[in-house]
């Protein structure tokens, strides 16, 4: 993964010369060491979770790779949370798959069933009252998460990342500031998913 991510960053820098690159995924953000001023990682907002938790029990919803990694444990330890805080790492890979397959758009029953199966027992057993959406896919499932767990606060790090971007690049406007979408997978399939979500933008292939 380290080689793939570092090569991709180098490729993007050479091809687009961006002011800033956001690694829009928690798993590589956690697992890959990147020390570049123009690269922003997306990491679990566990300090905020600890701050607002009443029960002292918070969950990190993430991928299996992240759950099993030493890097996530090190990240939790590095944040030096209060002793009253217990952190439960939960494999939400099945929820991520609902988004990657676009099932969250047109298969409500499957989403409801999967959300309950993956999280109900874990949340109940560990008395979770705050959960971080530590896969950037998971915010798309917020309507289902809030429906089944109204007493749990779900934290989406998107606004925090947007604030970091604004702080670094400022509010300057540019003729180049237009959105273009690229994918290294099937552009037609990805574009179809986006269109169902109301995003009418052309998807370009990035080899």
Language-model-derived ranges and their functions:
Residues 1-207:
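Non-catalytic structural scaffold of enzyme domains
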